[in-house]
Amino acid sequence: MGLRVKENGKSEGHPVMGWIGVASADNIILRESEQTSVWSFLTRKLGKQIQEAKQMTANTFAGAASHTEVNWRTINWSTVHQNVRRLQARIVKATQEGKWGKVKALQHLLTHSFSGKALAVRRVTENQGKNTAGVDKETWDTPDKKAEAIQTLKQRGYHPQPLRRVYIPKSNGRLRPLGIPALSCRAMQALYLLALNPIAETTGDRNSYGFRPERSTADAIEQCFNVLSHSYSAPWTLEGDIKACFDGISHEWLEAHIPMDKTMLHKWLKAGYIDKHIFHQTEEGTPQGGPITPPAMLQTLRIFFRR
């Protein structure tokens, strides 16, 4: 980890860092041992009754049954957003109360709902990378393709495709590797992002601004001014760079600490990538380019700086 210490004074025009370590919030470190076993116990004992109850609740939040034909043009997006936000609010509340078994159950409900799947497909087909294809060269550029994508976005039997490796220039003249997932994998990651973000935002450091929804560079600049403009402010700022942060992180550590479906996360981490028509396995690191990577790294940095 390289560090530079600079005396506070005139601005040198550097971009604001994505991580401003001024003061850590009272965050919660998620541990498997902290998760209640109530949900798994009920699932084992009540089996069919629990599954029926989950399905009834899922249908309430879904807005449409996942097995029926979907017409992209007639989807009520206001209802979809409302359903997703309602479940996310429940995840936030359960996180604040430390009810990790309930968090897990609500995440499952959201990632298997029609509203969650529809919103995930919409987000990956309307963002700036909507026309950027993965290794399968497939894009969802028509309403019919988008509707079909919702119906085929299923966890059972899901196997992620390898990433398409591309390189973009960095400010220092070097190249930054990016892994471009196929649209089907991007949509699946966007779906699980809906269930992970409420936890990441609830437990995240209040002074972290990079890769955060509803936060911008202007917000980071304002916080820097608020912290450094007083006579009693710290006379020094510390800038650090974690070398190859994305490339060298342990898969086992991520699977143990990121509060999401472990099986799905494992599949993404081990998907590999194709570079110049050659397949490469991934034994460590998380690719830059997928929707799930930023919140996963924010959770990693939160725990790192807390310790």
Describe the residue ranges of each PLM region.
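Short, motif-level signal for alpha-helix interfacial/capping segments enriched in acidic residues
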Residues: 75-77, 111-115, 212-226
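Short coil/turn segments at secondary-structure boundaries
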Residues: 101-108, 118-126, 133-139, 161-167, ...
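Amphipathic alpha-helical blocks
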Residues: 141-160
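Hydrophobic alpha-helical hairpins/lids featuring a short glycine-rich hinge
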Residues: 169-172, 177-196, 202
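Conserved polymerase palm-domain catalytic core
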Residues: 152, 156, 203-207, 212, ...
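Generic recognition of stable, solvent-exposed alpha-helical segments in well-folded globular domains
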Residues: 79-82, 86, 101, 105, ...
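Non-catalytic, polymerase-adjacent accessory regions of viral genome-replication enzymes
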Residues: 1-147
